[in-house]
Amino acid sequence: MALGFNRQTKKKIIFFGDSITQAGAGPGGYIKKMDSILAQTNKAANYELVGAGISGNKIYDLYLRMEADVLAKSPDAVVIFIGVNDVWHKRTSGTGTDPDKFENFYNAIIKKLKEKNIAVYLCTPAAIGEKTDFTNSLDGDLNNYAAIIRKIAATNNCPLIDLRQSFLDHLKTANRDNKDRGTLTTDGVHLNVAGNIFVAQKMFDALQKGFIK
């Protein structure tokens, strides 16, 4: 009689996004910080965290590359963290994404992922400037796109990681000098050391509620 054993398979979580996620997979990035949290909670053997971020990406870029960069890797869960460039690039280069197109592409991505029985988590874009009095030039647009993502999450029954609201709440007390950068970001957008730790904990907390056991 052949003897066998069951080898435990790690559950794979892919983080799908832009330059923030690309950096998140590097040293000190939020994905690496989450690896550390998993190790500290004796769960590292059960989960594989994979970064799939590309600088400059917008929602339609994710849609175009999701087959190769996500579906082909057979993840158990996907965390989508996108939206800053869809807003930011409207102002800087005129190549942002209109709200209706943003919503349509986002829904199409979720549909494809759910067809494969992949758990989908949505993140709101965190910041384009850290000022707390809503004088960052793109606060209005960013809040609008965050609201769209909240609606998409509710409509599709996807867990929401509301980084936009979390950043606003934290910065009220941590950025009393009303600086446009330096508390959680290096430049108002990309995460510094504190920002990577902050995002890692928020994502871990959300995943622990329904996916990480």
Predicted features along the sequence, with ranges:
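Alpha-helical cap/lid subdomain in secreted, periplasmic
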Residues: 33-45, 61-213
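Serine-esterase "nucleophile elbow" of acetyl-processing enzymes
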Residues: 1-55, 60, 65-74
